[in-house]
């Protein structure tokens, strides 16, 4: 007589493996024998495939699915979703999170969401919350979530062994990371901005987008910037073919990239672009992508190419500031280029601050952010990988700080602008480095108003010139030229065979026309 089969309790990771094997064509019987479970259990796993995957997506990818066995959800699912998003954001920013802080924040969200019920943010609730999302016990005890040097060192060693074992070259190793960009954040203090405090607080949730930078360790392959906004199709996109944008655009409501968006980007953008690049280099179409820890990311098992040759590896918790390549100055430099571009765009157009701010659209921001990412040099990227690959830099003795050079160049331009002579590099660095968590945007001091006055003084047309313009043989107004340029830009956005450089030229012409129109309006006052 056969003995009773021992009861086997599968982890979430085991169930994900079974789902993957089923998709590969393995039979129910084969898997039941392999895992020591009944065929009916395998069928149940297939039936609950979507629920299992969704649960795995909301768990800590480094430990949540490997240890967790049940999928019991929270009584207050909306609160649970908001809390894990908040927790991830605090962890990314290196902000201390204790059990008391978690409890208070949960209570705040419960009330803010207008939820009903007898909710008590007790220690029991906190324990269950951490278990549901695979959050390590050490997290939430009040220690600052900063770089864990021991974990970073251990990961570096293991990763280098993995690279050698898989025979991967730096060309085949990629890194990606995301950051929030307050795209309407302008320098504020004195002059025009100081007269109305409401204009100083330019940063609102509607004016924030997420950008994700991705490149390989050599810096030779930078994927198009990934941009995530709240609106599926912003008004500024009217008439624009999204496939013609210089970035890959997604929409969602959350503050950080959701699992579904990341999975879609990985499958539709990352994998095919990497395969194409490696093929052009005559290399095996095999690669690995390093991603940060956030628990909202899909499990590693869910992110791989169909042939399993392009995979994802997650960094351990709390090592982003130490070894995440894109966090070693790359994202910061992109933001600096973006902000410097805003100032240059403002000075080129010659509008007053409020008009410039009002006219600035998310489409403008996307082009400016794309330009900023394109300006990042390959040696800046290779230098960012030096902790994972100490010998990866071509010329390690030559270190170029793009951010410092950018600040110095902008300071030189402004110091040669009337009434901005006192602006120094420290002022610019302060604005460049202002964090999204601050109460207001940092300042450059008197830049915008002085720039207006300098341009009006320099370019204000004479009375004779204005008189000659009244009766020209054929006069085209700035307004008409601007309308035609806008229409032509809309046309180009709808075409799938236009070069980005062509569109950038027209956008530059539009900036010049706007500036001329502004100067003319001022001259008639």
UniProtKB/Swiss-Prot annotation:
Chain ranges of the HTH CENPB-type domain: 67-139
Domain DDE-1: 168-385
GO CC terms in record: nucleus
Gene3D superfamilies in alphabetical order: Homeodomain-like (1.10.10.60), Winged helix-like DNA-binding domain superfamily/Winged helix DNA-binding domain (1.10.10.10)
Subcellular location as annotated: Nucleus
SMART domains to which the protein is assigned, alphabetical: CENPB
Keywords from the UniProt entry: DNA-binding, Nucleus
Domain HTH psq-type intervals: 1-52
Signal peptide as annotated in the record: none
Molecular functions (GO terms): DNA binding
KW Nucleus (keyword) present: yes
Residues of the DNA-binding region: 28-48, 100-132
The organism's place on the tree of life at top rank: Eukaryota
Major localization listed first in the record, in broad terms: nucleus
Xref: PANTHER family: TIGGER TRANSPOSABLE ELEMENT-DERIVED PROTEIN 2, TRANSPOSON
Family affiliation: Belongs to the tigger transposable element derived protein family.
Protein name: Tigger transposable element-derived protein 2
């Amino acid at each position: 007589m056969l003995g009773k089969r021992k009861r086997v309790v599968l982890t979430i990771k085991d169930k994900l493996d079974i789902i993957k094997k089923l998709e590969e064509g393995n039979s129910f019987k084969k898997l039941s024998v392999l895992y020591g479970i009944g065929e009916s259990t395998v069928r149940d796993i297939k039936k609950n495939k979507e629920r299992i995957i969704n649960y795995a997506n909301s768990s800590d990818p480094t430990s949540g699915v490997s240890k967790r066995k049940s999928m019991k959800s929270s009584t207050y699912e909306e609160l649970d979703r908001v809390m894990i998003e908040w927790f991830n954001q605090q962890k990314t920013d290196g902000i201390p999170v204790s059990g008391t802080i978690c409890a208070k924040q949960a209570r705040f969200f419960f009330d803010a969401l207008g939820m009903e019920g007898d909710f008590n943010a007790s220690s029991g609730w906190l324990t269950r919350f951490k278990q549901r999302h695979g959050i390590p016990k050490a997290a939430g005890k009040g220690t600052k979530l900063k770089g864990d040097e021991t974990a970073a060192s251990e990961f570096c060693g293991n990763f280098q062994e993995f690279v050698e074992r898989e025979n991967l070259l730096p060309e085949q190793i990629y890194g990606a990371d995301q950051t929030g960009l307050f795209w309407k954040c302008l320098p504020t203090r004195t002059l025009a901005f100081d007269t109305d405090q409401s204009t100083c607080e330019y940063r609102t949730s509607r004016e924030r987008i997420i950008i994700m930078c991705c490149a390989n360790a050599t810096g030779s392959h930078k994927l198009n910037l990934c941009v995530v906004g709240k609106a599926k199709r912003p008004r500024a996109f009217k008439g624009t073919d999204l496939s013609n944008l210089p970035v890959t655009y997604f929409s969602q409501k959350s503050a950080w990239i959701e699992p579904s968006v990341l999975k879609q980007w990985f499958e539709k953008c990352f994998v095919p672009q990497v395969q194409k690049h490696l093929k052009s280099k005559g290399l095996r179409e095999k690669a690995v992508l390093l991603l940060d820890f956030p628990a909202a990311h899909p499990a590693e098992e869910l992110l791989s190419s169909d042939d399993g040759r392009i995979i994802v590896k997650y960094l351990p918790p709390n090592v982003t500031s130490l070894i995440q390549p894109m966090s070693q100055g790359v994202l910061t430099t992109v933001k600096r280029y973006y902000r410097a571009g805003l100032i240059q765009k403002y000075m080129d157009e010659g509008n007053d601050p409020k008009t410039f701010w009002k006219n600035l659209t998310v489409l403008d921001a996307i082009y400016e952010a794309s330009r900023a990412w394109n300006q990042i040099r390959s040696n800046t990227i290779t230098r960012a990988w030096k902790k994972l690959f100490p010998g990866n830099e071509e010329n390690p003795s030559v270190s170029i700080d793009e951010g410092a050079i950018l600040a110095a160049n902008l300071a030189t331009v402004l110091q040669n602008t009337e009434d901005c002579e006192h602006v120094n590099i420290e002022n610019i660095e302060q604005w460049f480095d202002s964090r999204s968590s601050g109460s207001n945007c940092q300042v450059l001091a008197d830049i915008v108003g002085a720039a207006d006055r300098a341009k009006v003084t320099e370019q204000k047309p004479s009375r004779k010139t204005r008189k000659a313009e009244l009766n020209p043989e054929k006069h085209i107004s700035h307004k008409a030229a601007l309308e035609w340029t806008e229409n032509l830009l809309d046309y180009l956005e709808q075409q799938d065979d236009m070069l980005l450089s062509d569109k950038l030229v027209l956008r530059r012409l539009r900036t010049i026309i706007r500036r001329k129109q502004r100067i003319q309006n001022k001259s008639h006052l």
